[in-house]
Each structure stands twice: as structure tokens, then as C-alpha cells.
Amino acid sequence: MNLHSKKDFQDCMLSILEPLKPYYSEEKARLTLGVTMAHYDIGATWMEAFSRPLWGLVPFWAGGGKAPEFEKIYRKGLTAGTDEKNPEYWGECTSFDQRFVEMAAISYGIMFAPEVVWDPLTEEQKENLCNYLNKINEHPLPVCNWILFAVLVNIAMKKVGRRYSPEMLEEYLNGLETFYLGEGWYQDGDSGQKDYYISFAIHFYSLIYAVIMEKDDPERAKKYKARAMEFAKQFIYWFDEEGEAIPFGRSLTYRFSQVSFFSVCLLAGLEPFPVPVMKGLIARHLRTWLKRPIFDRDHVLTIGYGYPNLTMAERYNAPGSPYWGMKVFAFLSLPDDHPFWSVEEAPLPKLAPACPQKYADLFVYHYGNHTTAFAPGVYSPNGHGQIVAKYGKFAYDTRFSISVAKSCYELHENAPDNMLAFWIDGYVYVRRICEESKITENGVWSKWSPYPGITVETTITPDAGGHTRVHKITSEIDCVAYDCGFAVSRGDFEEVGFAEKVDGMSAQASNEFCSCTVSAVLDENTQVNEVADKPPVGYMITVDPNTNLLYTKTKIPAVKYHIRKGSQEIVTRVDAEVI
């Protein structure tokens, strides 16, 4: 895909949204893209699908792009959706309402493309829209990135001279300060989580604030920009040389929003890296996504990651949710003479292999042509779906990706890649959340319990070939545990040259583009009679299809250990290679 000129990127954005046109309702306030449901009501579902394309259209319009049909759709839809007398009215708001999330994109439009979404409206239509958006000030919000939706609404209303709440604006901006940790990192409110919501939500919205409020609130604007510059130094480690991103945390179905932090940096006039580097990263990232089967037959984005997949979804994923990814196009607002449109793509800057990220609770290692994040399992227990798989694994890799569980009854259904999986009484138990953890200069340490009466202390030490795991286990029962490596594709519609080998205390899975070998390590102090009766053995798990986020059919190499009642230490070596 040619992504060089402004027109190239504009055409790319429009190619994603053009297929939606047949699915807008008569009054244009509803966009019906599928039949699956999220936990919120149908009115919010329609509003979400309607609003999220604005994350791409608004900067397109702000940068001079013309799309007359979409302009008419969105003016008519905004008018209908906020008119209580219209049959397509989006409905009343309640506490913690999904509608508040979708108000952010509409506010984005009012601020950056008023000539399309605001100026043409009649006075009555403007009043209806403002009254609807102001409902966000009348209800409580979750203490997380959601508070910034209210910030965007209030500064949008302020910009166009309409009613807003200075008190709520100040309260939420002060609340944002309580999220800040250091080195550019925030946590996502009281959840304590650090994931893509820090990049595509908190930094994204705070930089919009910095642009809009630079004259009214120069101190905060300067602070938010400085934090973004610092954050970029570590966040760039989440990508490999081909633009692939680490599949870590929730909302992975938002796909190419993973790189949108760098897009909004450009919008805000920030260059944490040279423009050619940022252009190269954004363009490569887009290409990796757009070559995958992420669209349905009508070219509508699907819920999933590398392919349609409801198993990995959160309870808040509705058919329109994936269009959050349109945030990647924030740079379309750049003027025609900006260097971004003429420079050639550059590769990533030279990065040190290891990057301990203490505020992110991650240790990231660049292996040349793939990148792995090693995690201690720190996250909120209030999950939205597959939370253990998205935060609790030992490793998250740009090329191997991760797998999600279908059940805890069988290993092949649990798909426990990069987990120490205990098999007890017919169930699979893995690390759900850690009790203690730390990120060191050499790796990751965590203390956790998969099952009552079993405690594990895991130390992970990455190096140039892979990583070594040391598990100190104290158990009140005898059981079996499988130390699992990365899932390796065994082919789907195309042959990938898959091969497997189980030999003694190791197992290897490989194909034409990658391999993973998992081996038990017995040090010189281990006595033969300690393991002779039940030594570790290599093991290959043929997992259920559609469990890995990138590859539809995989196998996971592992080592099977017999865990004795008492205390013991097991050491496993995982070598991973991308060819």
C-alpha cells in the first residue's frame, strides 16, 4: 500500500469508512453494523457506531479534505440524535453511560472542524446538541480515562461560547493529576492499569486540551506536552521494526489506534522523534493491519484482532466499537505544506535492547525483528473480558501474539501460552493476578498463587536469545504444571511449513517465519535421583482454533513438571526466533 502523500493517507482513511454509507439510518443518527451486542443499550450502540468514524473524518476535514456525502450524513445525524422529538433520538443519559464516551468524538468535531459539524446548524439544532452534550456534567463518571470525555465536552462548549461547567472542568483536570506516576506514565484511574489507554486515551485527550487551551491554560498545556515527550521515549519500545505492536491489555479490537499517540503528537506540534521516523512507524503500522482479514465481506471492521474473533472481546465491544481505531488519522489535520507529507519513511531509531519500564509494570526487550514485553501480572481484578490473558501472561510479543482461553477444563481449551499452568482435579489454573511484583534492571519478579495452598515466585530474565524463567514453588499438594512458551502458527488457509519436535526435556514448534523452543534446565546442583522418577518432559499442546489473536490454528511447546508437596525450584528456558 502506497502511503506517502497527503492524498494517499486521506484515501486510506476514506477507504475504511466508505463501506459504511449503506448502513446509516434514514435520519442518519443510527449506524447498524452487526447483530452482536455489548452490555449497554441499543441507543448507545447506535450512537457509538455513528460517532466513532468522526475520529477519522474530523482531522480529514480540518486538514482541508472534502467528503460532501459524509458532511451531510453527520450534520443530519447530529441534529436527529440530539432532538428529543426525533424518532432517532439517542436517548436519555444515566450514570456511567456509554453515551458519554461517544461525546468525545463529537466534541472533537466541534473544536477542529466547526465549519462542518457546528457552523451550518441552526440555532435550535446547536442548542439541542449543547444540551445533550452537557448531560455529561449531570452524572457521575468512572474514575478513569472517562473523566477526560467531560473535559473535551466542556472545552468544546467553551470554544463555541456555549454553556459549560467550569467547576466540573477543573475537578476533572485535577483528577487527572492523581493518575500521574512519572516518566510520562499515568495509570488509568483507580484501576491502576497501564495499557494502551495511557497512549490512545489519556495522552491523546490531554494533547487535544493542550492545543485548544494553549492560550487559556498555558501551564497545563506545557505540562501535558512535556509529559507526552517523555512518555514517547518508552512507548516507542512497544513497536517493532515492521510497525507491529505488542498485544497487551484490553481493547485490542481497536487495532490501529495502538499508534495513534504518535499521530496526535503531530497534531499537537510535538516531535519526540524526527518526522520521518514518526511517519515510518505510522505507515508501517497501518500496512500491517490493512493486509490482515480484519474486515467482513462488506468491508466493515470486525470485532477481533488479526481476524474476526468474539472470544477475545470485552463486554463493551459492540459492532461499531472497532472504529475507535480511526484515531490513528489525527495527523490528517496537518496543513498541506507540513514536512510529514513529503519526507520519506525512516526506520525506528537505534534502541537499546532492554527497556525496564517501572511505571508501566513492564520490561520490554527488542530482539531486532520482534519485540517482547515481560509482565508481572499487575492489573485490576474488575475485568471486562479475558483479563487474565491480556495482563497476566509472562510475555507479550509483537509477532507471536497471545492466546485467550475458551475454558479452564482442558489445556487445549485454556491455550496457556507463556503461562505456568497447573493441572489440578481436572482444571487448569494459571497466574490470575500477582500479590507482589517488581521490575528490575534485569527483568521481572512476581509472587502469585494459582490455587489455594500453592505459592509461586517467578523471576524472568530476558536476553538476546529469549528468556529464562525461575519458579520457586511451595505447594501443599502434589500436582502437575506445564511451563508454556509462545504459540506458533501451524497454518490456516496457507501452508506455513509447520514442524514440531518433542525430545526429552524440551519441545520445539516452528514454521517458515518463527520458532519457539522450551526446555527444562537442570543445574549442576540438581541430583539425578530428584528427577529420575518423574523428570520434566517436553510436551506439545495442540490448542483449540481461534484462540491466538493473530493465527487461527497454533501449537504451544511446553515442559511438563511434576510438582511435589513442599518446596522446589524449576527453571525453564524459552528461546524464540523470528526469521
Positions of predicted regions on the chain:
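Short, conserved charged micro-motifs
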Residues: A67, V275, C479-A481
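Solvent-exposed loop and beta-edge segments used for protein-protein assembly and interaction
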Residues: M47, F100, P319, Q357, ...
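Carbohydrate-active enzyme catalytic cores, enriched for enzymes
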Residues: K85-W90, L129, E241-P247, L252-G383
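Glycine-centered tight beta-turn/hairpin loop motif at sheet-sheet or coil-to-beta transitions
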Residues: Y205, N369-H370, P450-I454
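Low-complexity, glycine/alanine/valine/leucine- and proline-rich hydrophobic stretches
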Residues: P349-V428
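Aromatic-lined, polymer-binding surfaces characteristic
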Residues: G43-A49, W55-F60, A67, E71-S263
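Extended repeat-based interaction scaffolds and adjacent low-complexity, acidic/S/T/P-biased segments
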Residues: F400, S407-I579
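Low-complexity, Ser/Thr/Pro/Gly-enriched N-terminal "stalk/linker" regions
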Residues: M1-E48, K72-G77
